[in-house]
Amino acid sequence: MDMTNAQRLILSNQYYLMSQLTPENEAKYRRLQTIVERGYGLQMRELDKDFGCLPEDACRNIIDYMEMHHALQESYKMLDDASQSQVEPRRLQFLGFDAATESQQVHYVRFLTEEEGLYPQFDKSEHQFNSQVQMQDKYQRMLQTWRNCPRQYHLSSSEITQILSA
């Protein structure tokens, strides 16, 4: 993150104020204040790790992935017992994205589920939508297969299996 000295001074003052306003986080803000004041380049990257830009088409893709998982789950519920036995229910769970390499996507999913209240049926589990493995390519293949199905919200067990195996 490149900042002028004036910007660093302003940010340092903001961290100082935050340390005074929230005593429970004082150590965190003092640390950040020191990083900014002294200009430690490696640690300065921490400051902008949560700032990013997720373009509109990427947001729409994520919503499509989540909607596809919703359709998979609802279709599974409509299957008879014999058909349900052909699908492993845990595979229907929306896992999210890899926080290490797809952090913007993880944050967007959390925003949609926590702030916007969308997809309350999705289990956050202890990982909070951090799949711990890259998922973007897998979801894209699944989405393509799902879009080729004639009845996207009334899938058969074989269609569900095809989508999950994409």
Swiss-Prot record:
Domain of life according to the entry: Bacteria
Pfam families: YfbU
Classification via InterPro entries: UPF0304_YfbU (IPR005587), YfbU_alpha-helical_sf (IPR023146), YfbU_helix-hairpin_sf (IPR023145)
Similarity comment: Belongs to the UPF0304 family.
NCBIfam families: PRK05445.1
Name the record gives this protein: UPF0304 protein PBPRA2768
Species the sequence originates in: Photobacterium profundum (strain SS9)
